[in-house]
Every structure is written in structure tokens, then in C-alpha cells.
Amino acid sequence: MFALQAGISYDIFMYHKRPREQARHYDIQWHRQTGVFYPEQLSSETPTVGVSANTWREYMDLIRQAAADYPADHPADRFISPELMTTADIDLLEIPGQRDVVDDRLAKLEELSTSMPTAELVVGTPEYHPDGIYNSLVIIKNGTRRVLERKRTIFSSAEQGTFTASNTLQQQCTRTLSAVCADLVGYGMQYPQYPKLPQDTRAIHASCCWATPLEEGAHYAAAPDEERYTSTMTRALGRLFERYRQLRQVIVVDRTPPSTTIPPLNCVARRKTHNGIIES
């Protein structure tokens, strides 16, 4: 989750302006509705499918349909969910007491994954530990589950009261990095306290719940609206492509909660090419 909250040091006062530098670095294709979308793939990467849903029930309907349509001899696909998909219908502050619900939902996905054994389900979920709760991505394949990544950049006080920020990158030596929401902003920041992308990263798959106020009564710079919502995303993407010249593509799978009627910011951003040559 990425909160538009006043007082956070990521130049929120600039986000209402139309970004100009991004057009020089990347092209973007929007998928502004929930459902399944199939981005154009980088040739060397695992085929990726975005599964955008605003509720757990909607997500399960979509992923069950994907399983029913999935041919047994199909090459491996990676199905990406939004951030915290297993608790999409649960208030953020209630997540610490919902471990049984989360475990049950993950178990259902593990069972479902056996019907599509070569597929990888990347699911946003709380990860419960004695030392805290991580905002994590797990990867489920043929009935087994492992942690793929944990969120490293936590801006809002509401999230800080629920989740522990990870100080370790779980993925090492990977050309395609999975990221959780505000980590997109963190990776693009030019400050030492924010994490940096590994040098071999060529693509990012980001699971998001984007630009959403996280606590009642908070003093936000402004409530999310369509212009601010999209310009925040494009600014973050522009910083990534500017800072990391090796980065070729970013895929965002998003959801939005009931507090907004703005559709999700599912998108695929690719570094521009000139006469077939990728710009640097």
C-alpha cells in the first residue's frame, strides 16, 4: 500500500504536476480494470499473467477460471496478484488477528495449484512471525509454498503499526525482481536509507494497492483522485527508468479498496526503443 500522506519525504507536493521526463524513457500500456491481463513479455523471462481483483472472492473466481483454462502441457506461467490479496476484504488494523483466515486462504490456493502444476501463483499476503508480521509475496507451485519477497519500504504510520519492514532482499541474482507496492518508490529514491535494485535486474513485477489512504482521520496532502493517482505512478516509474539504465520493463498488478471508485492502475511500462534498439 502506498499512502498519499503529508509529511513523507518523497516530494508529494510535486505529484500534482504532470511529469515531463518519463516520456523520454518509457512507454506505458494501461489495463484500468480488474480481471486477467497478459503483458507482452521480455523474450528471456517466464510468461507473466496479471490477475487484478479488488476482493478475495473476485480473485478466487479469476484464478479458478485460469486453472480451468490452463492446458496441462502449457509452459510455466507466473500469475501475479495485487498486494495483500489474502486480506483484501479485511481492515488493515485487524490483520494481526486474522492468521487462521489467511492460512485457510493460502491452503485453498495450494490445493488449486495442483490442478495447474507448472504454473506459479504469486500472492500478496501477511506473513506471520514471532518477531512481527511481514507484508509479503509468496509463490505457490504444485501444492508447495515459499516466501518470494517481503516489503522493505513502509511509509504510513498505519502500516508501521501492523507490519515489520524487511531489511533483507529475499531474491538474489534474479533478472526479474518481484516487489511490493511502495518498494517501487523506494527503489527509485536517491537516498541511502532506501533499498537499491540489484545490478542484474532487467524487469520488475510489482504487486500493489496503490495511492490509498490507510487510516481514518489522517492529514493527507490530498485524497487520491484520478490525476494524482496516475501521476504518482508515472513519476515513480520515471524515476526507476532514469536511475537504473539496465531496467527494461515494469509490470504493475493493482487493486483498489472500497474507499475509492478509481479503477486499479494495472500497467506495463517498457523502456523506449529507437529503431529497434533499447534506449539508455
Would you name each region that the model predicts?
Residues R20-E21, I28-W30, A107, Y128-A203, ...:
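Active-site catalytic loop in hydrolytic enzyme cores
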Residues F13-W30, P224-S280:
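C-terminal beta-strand edge segments of enzyme domains
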Residues Y10, Y128, T153, P257, ...:
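Residue-level detector of flexible, active-site-proximal loop/helix-junction positions
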Residues F2-A3, Q33, P75, Y134, ...:
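A structure-centric signal for secondary-structure junctions around beta-strands
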Residues Q5, R78-I80, V122, S178, ...:
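Structural motif
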Residues W56-E149, A211-Q249, R255-P258:
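Cys-nucleophile CN-hydrolase/nitrilase-fold catalytic domain and related Cys-dependent amidase chemistry
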Residues M1-R18, A23-Y59, S136, L148-R150, ...:
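Active-site-proximal beta-strand elements of phosphoester/diester hydrolases
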Residues I8, M85, I154:
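Hydrophobic pocket-lining residues within nucleotide cofactor-binding pockets
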